[in-house]
Amino acid sequence: MFCIQCEQTIRTPAGNGCSYAQGMCGKLAATSDLQDLLIYMLQGVSVYATKARELGVVDPEVDTFVPKAFFSTLTNVNFDDERIIAYAKQAAEYRESLKNAYEAACEAAGKSAESLPPVAQFVLGTSKPEMLSQAPVALLNKDKNDIHEDILGLRLLCLYGLKGAAAYMEHARVLGKTDAEIAGRFHEIMAFLGEPSVDADKLFITAMDIGQLNYRIMAMLDAGETEAFGHPEPTVVNTKAVKGKAILVSGHDMKDLELILEQTAGKGINVYTHGEMLPALAYPAFKKYAHLVGNYGSAWQNQQKEFANFPGAVVMTSNCIIDPNVGQYSDRIFTRSIVGWPGVTHVVGDDFSVVIDKALALDGFQYDEIPHNITIGFARNALMAAAPTVVENVKNGSIKHFFLVGGCDGDKSERSYFTDLAKSAPKDSVILTLGCGKYKFNKLEFGDINGIPRLLDIGQCNDAYSAIQLAIALSQIFECDINELPLNLVLSWFEQKAIVVLLTLLSLGVKNIRTGPTPPAFLTANLAKILEEKFGLRNTTTVEADLKTMLNVA
């Protein structure tokens, strides 16, 4: 086992990364090894997908399968060995199919098939023990003693960034949005990473390419969500319980939420969002469901306590899931799509009857709690509509600064930095937030500036796209570069979606971003220095010191 992809990975003087019997996320060594093997198989598929594409052979099934299966290896997504093995076997079948199609296309074109790299020729074992014995071939740091640590760091930056992009591709696909050109570029990068490079410049360029690719993917996802559900609008949301039977929907998949709402209509069940599903409540399409009563709980890391206290059924539509046995609710939590946990019921297809039956059999909430409201829904359209008013308040001096404070949440005490930063932001500043990092402060009162709320919740982590559009619009209005705006980005990171959002921002030329609470363990000190010199990327320090720098206070 070697896994170093998330913020909570083990860090010791002897070396970084989880490499023992179990990772900090709860992932067992065997699961980690199988995931590495799956990635290796997917890279082999992408090699053939890329070569076949050069001859005009495109398989849409493969184009959707590879990102989806890759998504299953993100932090806190799938801990079920049998599901990972099934993905690996499916990858082997797709690779063989593409191999045959590629060779047939070569023959038809009168050319010889190329000799492809080992990753495209690897023969997957037929049993779990055999696959585990093959794991060293796919270990991400297998050649660490033969290469410079910066090379390994750059490879991992690319791999983890591409994982985040794969997740957004799958979210978009669920909403009916795919793009053959994007899929082709995705395969090219997967294939490149399957043949480990030692060229630092090429790896760095690839990291930026991944950021650019993800910008297009986020635009595609934004289109999928807004075309399906309308544009989010400022919406007041209750965060307390309502009397009645209950289902909690966590993750990111709004299509699943829609299906659950349709199937629970008239059944006396209240539906709540959780975590990154909170932004769904701002979409017009969901407002017709009176039994979508609000948001329950907070960010992913608190789920073992919150789900244990929730007297209904829970559906995990995507990341993040953690051990449900701790809170003894494994019999009433259900997984979907790429999510998996051993022993937990997995819902296949679009029928949520098993979830509904469980919710009806449980007690539900026995009384209404005193409501506590928050306001959400300041995504792209709402921000653009407010832009003239915002500009006017900037010009008259009422708004002097903007902070984007968001990203992933986590349980490290150092993450109180983000709460303190939001609290300490000057009263003449506006705070934009997104991702589950918002839960560090989104229930606090920040007031307004001439009717403009000082806290603007943009949405999910992928709604960084909305923030980028606002920044571009403001830079055009003020006729300046984005980096000349009175705007500072302070991003909390935890997993691979945050990595790819960061790469996207860097690839767009956004500078002086702060990240925290700790830098990625796979980034060497030298790489961190290069990123700081090139982009001004730096780690958070203290709220007082960082605010002085951001506000140019002597």
Curated annotation (Swiss-Prot):
Role played: Catalyzes the reduction of hydroxylamine to form NH(3) and H(2)O.
Cofactor: [2Fe-2S] cluster; hybrid [4Fe-2O-2S] cluster
EC primary class: oxidoreductase
Catalytic activity: A + NH4(+) + H2O = hydroxylamine + AH2 + H(+)
GO biological process, one term: response to hydrogen peroxide
Pfam families: Prismane
Protein name, entry field: Hydroxylamine reductase
Record gene name: hcp
Gene Ontology terms, MF aspect: 2 iron, 2 sulfur cluster binding; hydroxylamine reductase activity; metal ion binding; peroxidase activity
Keyword vocabulary terms for this entry: 2Fe-2S, Cytoplasm, Iron, Iron-sulfur, Metal-binding, Oxidoreductase
Lineage top rank: taxon: Bacteria
Modification sites for Cysteine persulfide: 408
Free-text comment on the cofactor: Binds 1 [2Fe-2S] cluster.
Binding site for hybrid [4Fe-2O-2S] cluster: 252, 276, 320, 408, 436, 461, 495, 497
NCBIfam families: hybrid_clust, PRK05290.1
Subcellular location: Cytoplasm
GO cellular component: cytoplasm
